[in-house]
């Protein structure tokens, strides 16, 4: 109302329209709308048509007094380290390169890097020579900064509406980085990752570009996870399993294919471990319940409620690892099975200490405490699966 400077404003229309459902009056020929703003603070809207007169009188509200319920700035005391790692609690940044790094979420790279290590170990053909070390580092760059960075950037792009509800101060919804800049980053990271995959195939002497196919398949999976029309993340089960497979199976397969040969038993074992990855992915869903519910995304905390979802989460993580330990025991590898069980126990302790108490408040603390034992368990399984 503060934009109306004249005492009386009158609007006439020239064609027939309708009245919409949100209170906007559309006019037809010979209709008129008169808006009167008085010094008393009251305003009058008069709508007239042949045979009808509609009057609305209301008190004026100063728009400066109406404030959004959602903060449009990052919480005070945000950390610059959190900003660079791409995790919550980040400070707001104006430097474009720091913002670009934030979008790639470097905190998510280590599991992919570790997956390459596990695959190389499972191949049984990795040697501590300069060439093998260089190949493994290049494979880690492909899996971590390039393709995980691509995945995280494209996910943030398609999550911009949810982030506008949950965290409107994040780089994309806040406008700190423009649409063309985001799209450019997506393409640079994707093409960079696929290019490195092709180089690795040539370096390894592959007649079939296995690493390239894995990188291409993983990139496609990342896209349909985040983007419509499929948008796998809309379904808590399918989306989180796809995420788990991306973080555990794909980098393992890439590392093993680079130094050896993928075998059916390893494929099955890593896909089984991806169910644990599903549980890990659910941990991140609790902080987005409000936005997911508003936009109709059926994450497991939305579909089942927080209490049920947190037990599904820990069940997926623990039962999967115990099943793998049972598989190793049945395969005649009792010491590896025992080592894996020893690594599961502290995870259960931290689940009860942090996650099951409050999955929103303690999600970061739980992951920092428990996940090192999970990734060590994956490495133990890789050593047990050496070919």
UniProtKB/Swiss-Prot annotation:
Localization in the cell: Plastid, Chloroplast membrane
Pfam families: UbiA (PF01040)
Protein name per Swiss-Prot or TrEMBL: Chlorophyll synthase, chloroplastic
Region (Disordered): 62-81
A cellular-component GO term for this protein: cytosol
Lineage: Eukaryota, Viridiplantae, Streptophyta, Embryophyta, Tracheophyta
UniProt family annotation: Belongs to the UbiA prenyltransferase family. Chlorophyll synthase subfamily.
Catalytic activity, reaction form: phytyl diphosphate + chlorophyllide a + H(+) = chlorophyll a + diphosphate
Chain's gene name: CHLG
Topology versus the membrane: Multi-pass membrane protein
TM stretches of this protein: 182-202, 210-230, 241-261, 266-286, 311-331, 336-356, 364-384
